[in-house]
């Protein structure tokens, strides 16, 4: 067999596990419109509705606005990604 589907490390991480692990951490939320929101993920529900703090809005890679709190409706979300030093976290 090719080993497809076998566990490499003995544990399987699901998308739900990933989403739980990034709560309270810096994330990038990309919308279907192409706009990026970068901030701290505070809340996420089963419909992918998102609440963020310390949020920055980027349009075409340019910072357009900053918000204390931001709420994004789940049907607008293309993806959620963790960030690596993109916020002012000292990285």
Curated annotation (Swiss-Prot):
Q: What is its main location?
A: cytoplasm
Source organism (scientific name): Arabidopsis thaliana
Location of the Sm domain? 14-86
Which terms does the record give in the GO molecular function aspect? Answer: mRNA binding
Q: Which family does it belong to?
A: Belongs to the snRNP Sm proteins family.
Key words of the record: Cytoplasm, mRNA processing, mRNA splicing, Nucleus, Ribonucleoprotein, RNA-binding, Spliceosome
Would I find Cytoplasm among this entry's keywords?
yes
Where does this one sit in the cell? Cytoplasm; Nucleus
Q: What is this protein called?
A: Sm-like protein LSM36B
Tell me the disulfide pairings in this chain: none
Can you supply a Gene Ontology BP term from the record?
deadenylation-dependent decapping of nuclear-transcribed mRNA
Q: Which SUPFAM superfamilies match?
A: Sm-like ribonucleoproteins (SSF50182)
One GO cellular component term of this record is: Lsm1-7-Pat1 complex
**Superkingdom as given in the UniProt entry:** Eukaryota
For whether the record's keyword set contains RNA-binding, the answer is yes
What's the stated role of this polypeptide? Answer: Component of LSM protein complexes, which are involved in RNA processing. Component of the cytoplasmic LSM1-LSM7 complex which is involved in mRNA degradation by promoting decapping and leading to accurate 5'-3' mRNA decay. The cytoplasmic LSM1-LSM7 complex regulates developmental gene expression by the decapping of specific development-related transcripts. Component of the nuclear LSM2-LSM8 complex which is involved splicing nuclear mRNAs.
Tissue specificity, in the record's words, reads:
Expressed in roots, leaves, stems, flowers and siliques.
User: Self-association or partners: how does it assemble?
Assistant: Component of the heptameric LSM1-LSM7 complex that forms a seven-membered ring structure with a donut shape. The LSM subunits are arranged in the order LSM1, LSM2, LSM3, LSM6, LSM5, LSM7 and LSM4. Component of the heptameric LSM2-LSM8 complex that forms a seven-membered ring structure with a donut shape. The LSM subunits are arranged in the order LSM8, LSM2, LSM3, LSM6, LSM5, LSM7 and LSM4. LSM6B subunit interacts only with its two neighboring subunits, LSM3A or LSM3B and LSM5.
